[in-house]
Amino acid sequence: MSKDTASQPSLTKLIGLDIFGVGRLHAILLICIFLSAIGVVLATHNTRQMTVQRENLLLEKDILDGEWRNLILEESALAEHSRVQARSVRELDMERPAPDKEVIIKLR
Protein backbone atom coordinates (compact mmCIF):
# COMPACT_ATOMS: atom_id res chain seq x y z
CA MET A 1 0.00 0.00 0.00
CA SER A 2 2.83 2.35 0.62
CA LYS A 3 3.92 1.81 -2.96
CA ASP A 4 0.47 2.86 -4.25
CA THR A 5 0.36 6.12 -2.27
CA ALA A 6 3.89 7.04 -3.29
CA SER A 7 3.15 6.62 -6.99
CA GLN A 8 -0.06 8.68 -6.86
CA PRO A 9 0.27 12.48 -6.74
CA SER A 10 -1.39 14.29 -3.85
CA LEU A 11 -4.73 16.07 -4.21
CA THR A 12 -3.21 19.55 -3.80
CA LYS A 13 -0.74 18.83 -6.58
CA LEU A 14 -3.56 17.66 -8.84
CA ILE A 15 -5.61 20.81 -8.13
CA GLY A 16 -2.57 23.00 -8.74
CA LEU A 17 -1.80 21.24 -12.02
CA ASP A 18 -5.44 21.50 -13.06
CA ILE A 19 -5.68 25.24 -12.31
CA PHE A 20 -2.32 26.28 -13.72
CA GLY A 21 -2.07 23.67 -16.44
CA VAL A 22 -5.35 22.74 -18.01
CA GLY A 23 -7.49 25.49 -16.45
CA ARG A 24 -5.09 28.35 -17.08
CA LEU A 25 -7.56 30.14 -19.36
CA HIS A 26 -10.32 29.83 -16.79
CA ALA A 27 -8.08 31.21 -14.04
CA ILE A 28 -7.09 34.18 -16.20
CA LEU A 29 -10.74 34.85 -17.06
CA LEU A 30 -11.71 34.64 -13.38
CA ILE A 31 -9.02 37.17 -12.45
CA CYS A 32 -10.20 39.47 -15.26
CA ILE A 33 -13.79 39.23 -14.01
CA PHE A 34 -12.72 40.15 -10.46
CA LEU A 35 -10.65 43.09 -11.71
CA SER A 36 -13.56 44.28 -13.85
CA ALA A 37 -15.94 44.05 -10.87
CA ILE A 38 -13.55 46.07 -8.70
CA GLY A 39 -13.31 48.66 -11.49
CA VAL A 40 -17.11 48.96 -11.65
CA VAL A 41 -17.32 49.43 -7.88
CA LEU A 42 -14.62 52.12 -7.92
CA ALA A 43 -16.22 53.94 -10.85
CA THR A 44 -19.62 53.91 -9.13
CA HIS A 45 -18.11 55.20 -5.90
CA ASN A 46 -16.29 58.03 -7.70
CA THR A 47 -19.45 58.96 -9.60
CA ARG A 48 -21.44 59.19 -6.38
CA GLN A 49 -18.77 61.32 -4.73
CA MET A 50 -18.67 63.69 -7.71
CA THR A 51 -22.48 63.91 -7.75
CA VAL A 52 -22.51 64.92 -4.07
CA GLN A 53 -19.75 67.47 -4.70
CA ARG A 54 -21.67 68.89 -7.68
CA GLU A 55 -24.83 69.29 -5.58
CA ASN A 56 -22.87 71.07 -2.86
CA LEU A 57 -21.31 73.41 -5.42
CA LEU A 58 -24.73 74.18 -6.93
CA LEU A 59 -26.09 75.05 -3.48
CA GLU A 60 -23.09 77.31 -2.84
CA LYS A 61 -23.61 78.94 -6.25
CA ASP A 62 -27.26 79.68 -5.41
CA ILE A 63 -26.24 81.27 -2.10
CA LEU A 64 -23.56 83.38 -3.80
CA ASP A 65 -26.00 84.45 -6.54
CA GLY A 66 -28.45 85.68 -3.90
CA GLU A 67 -25.68 87.56 -2.12
CA TRP A 68 -24.54 89.08 -5.44
CA ARG A 69 -28.06 90.33 -6.20
CA ASN A 70 -28.29 91.90 -2.75
CA LEU A 71 -24.93 93.63 -3.23
CA ILE A 72 -26.00 95.00 -6.63
CA LEU A 73 -29.19 96.40 -5.07
CA GLU A 74 -27.20 97.93 -2.22
CA GLU A 75 -24.71 99.48 -4.64
CA SER A 76 -27.45 101.01 -6.78
CA ALA A 77 -29.16 102.40 -3.68
CA LEU A 78 -25.94 103.90 -2.33
CA ALA A 79 -24.91 105.37 -5.69
CA GLU A 80 -28.25 107.03 -6.38
CA HIS A 81 -27.61 110.61 -7.57
CA SER A 82 -30.09 112.34 -5.28
CA ARG A 83 -28.70 110.52 -2.23
CA VAL A 84 -25.10 111.45 -3.09
CA GLN A 85 -26.06 115.05 -3.74
CA ALA A 86 -28.05 115.36 -0.48
CA ARG A 87 -25.22 113.84 1.54
CA SER A 88 -22.61 116.10 -0.06
CA VAL A 89 -24.67 119.17 0.84
CA ARG A 90 -25.47 117.97 4.35
CA GLU A 91 -22.10 116.54 5.45
CA LEU A 92 -19.56 118.41 3.32
CA ASP A 93 -21.36 121.74 2.83
CA MET A 94 -20.94 121.41 -0.92
CA GLU A 95 -23.16 123.22 -3.37
CA ARG A 96 -23.36 123.56 -7.09
CA PRO A 97 -21.30 126.52 -8.40
CA ALA A 98 -23.08 129.38 -10.10
CA PRO A 99 -22.82 129.38 -13.91
CA ASP A 100 -20.71 132.55 -13.87
CA LYS A 101 -18.14 130.84 -11.59
CA GLU A 102 -17.71 127.81 -13.85
CA VAL A 103 -14.43 127.68 -15.78
CA ILE A 104 -14.21 125.70 -19.00
CA ILE A 105 -10.80 124.36 -19.95
CA LYS A 106 -10.18 123.37 -23.54
CA LEU A 107 -7.75 120.58 -24.29
CA ARG A 108 -6.05 120.07 -27.60
Curated annotation (Swiss-Prot):
InterPro entries according to UniProt: Cell_div_FtsL
A Pfam cross-reference name: FtsL
Membrane topology: Single-pass type II membrane protein
Example of a GO biological process term: FtsZ-dependent cytokinesis
Residue ranges that the UniProt entry lists as topological domain Cytoplasmic: 1-24
Coiled coil: none
Compartments reported by the entry: Cell inner membrane
GO CC terms in record: cell division site; plasma membrane
Main location as per UniProt: membrane
Chain segments annotated as transmembrane: 25-45
Periplasmic compartment residues: 46-108
Keyword list, A-Z: Cell cycle, Cell division, Cell inner membrane, Cell membrane, Membrane, Transmembrane, Transmembrane helix
Subunit structure and binding partners: Part of a complex composed of FtsB, FtsL and FtsQ.
Family listed: Belongs to the FtsL family.
Function per UniProt: Essential cell division protein. May link together the upstream cell division proteins, which are predominantly cytoplasmic, with the downstream cell division proteins, which are predominantly periplasmic.
Stated name of the protein: Cell division protein FtsL
